[in-house]
Each structure stands twice: as C-alpha cells, then as structure tokens.
Amino acid sequence: MTDAAIPIHALASNDLAAWLEGAPSEVRAWVAAHDFKAKPGTHLVVPETGGGIAGVLAGLSEPTSLWDLASLAKTLPSGTYALAPTPAVSDADKAEALMLGWILGSYTFDKYRDAAPQPAKLTPPTGVDSARVEALAEAIYTVRDLVNTPANDMGPTELAAAAKGLADRFDASFDVTIGDALLDDNYPAIHAVGRAAKDSPRLIEMTWGDPDHPTVALVGKGVCFDSGGLDIKSATGMKWMKKDMGGAAHVLGIALAVMALKLKVYLKVLIPAVENAISGDAMRPMDVVRTRAGISIEIGNTDAEGRVILADALTRAGESNPEVVIDFATLTGAARVALGTELPALFCNDDTLANAVLVAGTNAEDALWRMPLWPGYRKMIEGKVAEITNSAEGGYAGAITAALFLERFAPKDVMAWNVSSKPGRPEGGEAMGLRAFVAALAERYGRA
C-alpha cells in the first residue's frame, strides 16, 4: 500500500469486532453511529478530521467473492485506494480476485456519449499476479466493447479489423477469406448465410504460438447482426441482435488472454463473420446448403444460421489436427429458457475436460452448467432431402439438438467444447465462461 493511497479495510462480518478493537476511539464511534456491520456489498467511508478520507470499511462475503468490491470503483470518490492488510485478504488469490472485480466494476461503454467520470483506482495488492489480472480484465473489456458496439459499426469488416489488430499486436499470422472467395476455397455454408448482406461474409483466421506446442482451436460465431433472414424475427426478437457475434467476441477475448499470458499452446482462431440479412439473394427455407465437410444441410429455418456457418469453421479447425476445439456461440433461446441469462450451457464430449472446465469455472466464479449430448435426439436433426436439418421439428430440446448438429462437424477423436450463452446482460455485453476457459487452459498447458 502506497502512502498516497486511501486504505480499504475489507472485512467479513465476523472479523469486524476484532478489527475495531485496534481502531481509534473516534473510528469505533463512527462505525457504531452508522450501524455498520460489514455485510457483503456494504461500505463505510471514514472521514479525516480535516475533511479528507481516512479510510474505507468494506463488507465481504464468506467466502470472499470476486464481486465484493466491484461496485466501489464507481461509488467511492475518485482517487487511489489500496487494500489494507486484513484476515480476509491475506491470501494472494483472494486479493487478486478482489482486484479483478474492482477493475471489471470500473468498465463503462461511452463510445457514443460524453466520457463518464474517472472511476476510483485500486493499486495492485502485494503478491498479486498483476499481469494475469490485467490480461483477464482487458480480455473481458474487449468482449464487452465488441458486443456493445452497434452493428452499423461492428459488421464483418469491423470484426475482421478487430481480429487483425489483435494479431498485429501479438505477432500472430492473420488471414481472411471474403465474399465469393469463400466458394473458391470451399466454405459454401458461410457464403450461403452471408451472401445477402452488403458487407460480404468472410472467414477470419489467426494463428499464434510455437507449432511444437499442443494445438488449441478457438471457433466463434460471428453473426454481426441477425434479422432472422426470410424467417424474419419480430421487432422484439431482433432488437438486441447486435449481440449475435458474442461467440466471436469471446474467442477474441480468450485469444487475447492466451497470448498475453503466453500459454504454451499453438493457437488457431477461426471466426465465420456474416450478417444474416434479407435480399433477393437471401438463403430460403428448405434450401439445401453444402458444407466444407461434404455434409448437406436442409435449411429448416433461416434464423438458425449460426450453426450453419460454424459447420464450415469447425471443419476447417479440424484440419489443423488440434488437441482441443472450443466453440463459443449464441445459438439458441432454449439454453436461456433452461438455465437463465447468467449461466452458460456447456456441451462437451470428454468427461475429464468437462469436469476441468466446470471446476475452473466454480473457482473463478464464472460458472457453467453441463448439458447432455443425448444421442437419442440425433434423429431429430435428420433432414428430409438432405443429410441433416438446421432446425429440429417439434420445438423440443433446442439447445441439445443445436449441439448435436455441431458435433457432426467437430473433428473426430478430438475433445470438443461448445458453449451456448447469452453474452448480453441488461447493462450490456458480458464475457461469460471466459475466465473459466482461460483458467482451464492455463492449468492444462501452463505459461511460458
């Protein structure tokens, strides 16, 4: 803690009495007058006699939560603060979590309005891995910024530019296949979904790391706006469809963290980026679309387009013989109905890896919930004139049938993860599952 920083005494309620025993009498009187009990989410500013701030008391959960101090960044007066030594934050991991929560609570998306007042700042606590905190925070900010940006400023072109900027920063190789070149290079499904839009469809590819390290492929759905296509959405359903590229945003956020932390992996990032638009060239219901894998898809619903573009991207990912494929996508409302808006669904075909991700998510307070790849539902995605359909009839098990669809295109004998989540929360875009996956990858492969 620096001399200029205002101390924050973060305390669980059962530690408050012991702390007060060593506090000056005027502080004890102030705490009593305000009936401060150190309940989670509460705080008390302790004044100096000269009118400044002597310190802040902040209540902690038991066990300590990442989010315990997150609101303080915007509720405390501007200035620099530091965690004072207390029993609850003596553990470096707990202090690190509190610092990350503080930074995440500082986030504001003000690209289109006057800048918000500068939030209060927290100096890194002693023993904290500041590089890891900063990498995770920047990764999450990146996801939030990308998802919050409206579609008129975040189409396939701009999404590719964001990926290119990340590649340049970390000396990763970058390639993009655009428009009719998708047909020339055998990505017909991506082309079919995106060809109706003015901003041409594309496949974004980024590669980073040592080829001698295990290959990890990240695949993210990049539907930059989803009108539903000819099976058009309602006004309510369409309103927040700028967030339908949340899977791509998550992949770029994870890639940023992986590269910043120098994980010992050979990273492959693939993002099929399209707008699902309406025009005379739009994909029609009951069209049959070919894929890079040679599997034919019957378009049961043009609003189930995300899995169609992911089919080509997953096939491409498998061509690099990865050890792990991780696929992030906002595929179905069914997952939201089943699990709500704060708990992403995890589909995984390997029990060991699924458990590793679930444990990492619990430890990082970034929980996921595993859903079954129930083989009995495969018949629900059988096509009538094509091999499979992108929209199972009947309306049942929508999240599972979407995952089973993607499983057809995942490389064989490779452990494949698929996360179906809702990246947009009421306050805007959010990174869900990112910290869990970064932690699981770091645990599995280590840092250079």
What does each of the following model-derived ranges do?
Residues A160-A448:
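A generic structural signal for tightly packed, nonpolar segments enriched in small/aliphatic residues
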